[in-house]
Amino acid sequence: MADMSVKQLADLVRTTPERLLEQLKEAGVAITHVDQTISDEEKRKLLLHLKTSHSTETDKKRSKIVLKRKKLSVVKSGKKSVNVEIRSKRTYTKPVVEQKRETEPAPTQEVPPTSDTTNLNEKAEVNVATLEKAVEAEVKEEAKKTPSEKKETPKKGPRKETRRSRKPDKEDKWEREELHMTKLVEERRRRHKPAHMPDSDSASAKLEQGFARPTAPVVREVALPESITVADLAQKMSVKAAEVIKAMMKLGAMVTINQRIDQETAAIVVEEMGHKPKLIKEDVLEENLVATLGEQTGEAVPRAPVVTIMGHVDHGKTSLLDYIRRTKVTSTEAGGITQHIGAYHVETELGMITFLDTPGHEAFTAMRARGAKCTDIVVLVVAADDGVMPQTVEAIQHARAAKVPVVVAVNKIDKPEADPERIKTELSTHDVLPEEWGGDTMFQPISAKTGEGIDALLERILLQAEVLELKAVDNGPARGMVVESRLDRGRGPVATVLVTSGELHLGDILLVGREYGRVRAMIGDDGRPCESAGPSMPVEVLGLSGTSVAGEEAIVVPDERKAREIARFRQGKYREVRLAKKQTAHLERIFDRMGEGKQNTLNIVLKADVQGSLEALTEALNKLSTDEVKVNIIASGVGGITESDVNLAIASDAVVIGFNVRADAPTRVLVEREGVDLRYYSIIYDLIDEVKKALSGLLAPEFEEKIVGLAEVRDVFRSSKIGAIAGCMVVEGVVRRHLPIRVLRDNVVIYEGQLESLRRYKEDVAEVRQGTECGIGVKNYNDVKVGDQIEVYEKTQVHRTIA
């Protein structure tokens, strides 16, 4: 604290400089003038003097009151009696209040230089006043008590005396806090208090709770995991679960208190109820692992480019790869079309290139997207005689989404009807411009049959790779992507992994999505086992715990325990999210099904050879569902058809479909014995067409009405047996017996029924043709009048198909 003058200090403590000089003199501080400065040491000396003088004056003003009490009582136990005498002594200090002098014009308020002295004075005054009140109340209580009231049982006497002896301590504790009460409230409370409770209202007032009901709604920030139950969501918002259920009913969703909802639905509910959602991810363990493995030490070296061949079906993608590899891969594909991704590492005269061959069928959209995700260059194959097709446009969109350069290969130029210039024009409408037109896309005419232009295509691919400057670290823990996975009967789960960085060795712990395992064997694209694989190398890995999802990232983990922990965590999270989405979809359709009739369902057990084909088939079959019929895939998997699949089909009345897989001998015996519908397919076209036919058979029959003839009523006769007989003239078509009819009056249908009798000249006939008179009897209808028209029609069933 900086030094200040006596005058400044007097202004600060709000007293006169003369009074402050007197106090300084009494404290022994040698200051005689108001303009002299006072140091911190002199201030502390003054404060100590004021505290000492104040306590001395207070002690002089106090006097002591000693209260003695003696109680006699008798305790009887049977014939004996014991006299009990209880003595108590209590001492109180009573302050003497001095009268203020009238001679002083105005009282001066002495304020010590620090806040410590002020608090000490206030606490001393409160303590003295409280003790004075306690003494007065105790004296009044002693005067009011009668001898009969003083007699107490010996058991209660000491207990009450002990309580009363503790009261001054309690009051002292309460007096440590300041009391904020108006005088009116204090007087009103004192009037209703009994006399034996001395000044307890001040103590109870200090113990009052300070809670006040909020006037404005409380807005909370609610942390939402990827799935949460309705009860937990209500607890996070501090509301009842019934309110959350009510809010979701307003949004059109029926939920229960223990039902799980996904993160997006929970965020909408939180916003609807006036709070702020905060989306959190429960994958901290995964992020930490990726962060630790993300720092790969080592120098980046050039690597081979990963080239994905895309295009429409039957445009020659696999044939182009055949010519480059000098093999016949197309002959191994059913129907000559690619139905899964093939990864091949090709060593050409110009350099190393890794090729990915993707399917062109529309059902394999997800597989093409995966191919574009892990590639460096996309070779777009377009047939010169066919032009740009839907899957060609889709491949362009995948390449743009992945921000990958495109090299266009115009195939089949050896055909007479080939027109490469038309291909350039059609691709230019999709913003794919050749270099000679001022664009940045390289075009190369080729023929996968004769080999024309293929060397030039490889040169363009490697030129594009040099421009991209592709590099990767070739040592350390490996990272890659699962291109395809399948379940081999003899070797177990097999995953085709494309290494992107690092080096994969035998014995490494590999973590792939929800699966993990030790690499027991690695097989190259040429079918030979290998010890290690570097960047841009595709290998088949054996040893995983299950068939992994294609497109997942593969990471080498140093610890098997950590890999197992992360895999189980991912499995639990995937199960919760899938269950939440399934329940949400089920509840969204509940109201739609209430007003509709029974929906016919075709249950299917689907088995495929690889994971990618299974995904494509599942998506394609689910798209066939309509409002009337539905495809329900109750089970799907990778690998051969087993007895458990057949038993599941028996229990659910399902059709077993195998795509490029077969059933073993015991399973075939079970199929024949139980009569299960088992079908094998190797081409996706045939599978989808057969399922369409099966769904068409489940459609409700549709009937079409065809007007056969029209007769005009000329006269009406009455018959005792039949009733009214209409004499008619057939004016159009043929009138046949036992066909449904309509009676029209003024071109308005007034009755629909059955033609009961048809006569001509009193003879029953089967039909009457145009221009012939006849008598017609309508079943259960006698109100036929002249001028009416009788329309005869028949219903024919129309064959319905799935579009």
Swiss-Prot record:
It comes from Coxiella burnetii (strain RSA 493 / Nine Mile phase I). Residues 93-123, 138-206 are annotated as: Disordered. Residues 111-121 have a biased composition (Polar residues). Belongs to the TRAFAC class translation factor GTPase superfamily. Classic translation factor GTPase family. IF-2 subfamily. SUPFAM superfamilies: Initiation factor IF2/eIF5b, domain 3 (SSF52156), P-loop containing nucleoside triphosphate hydrolases (SSF52540), Putative DNA-binding domain (SSF46955), Translation proteins (SSF50447). HAMAP family: IF_2_B. This is Translation initiation factor IF-2. Residues 336-340 are annotated as: G2. The gene is infB. GO terms for cellular component: cytoplasm; cytosol. The keyword Nucleotide-binding applies. Residues 138-155, 168-188 have a biased composition (Basic and acidic residues). NCBIfam families: IF-2, small_GTP. GO terms for biological process: translational initiation.
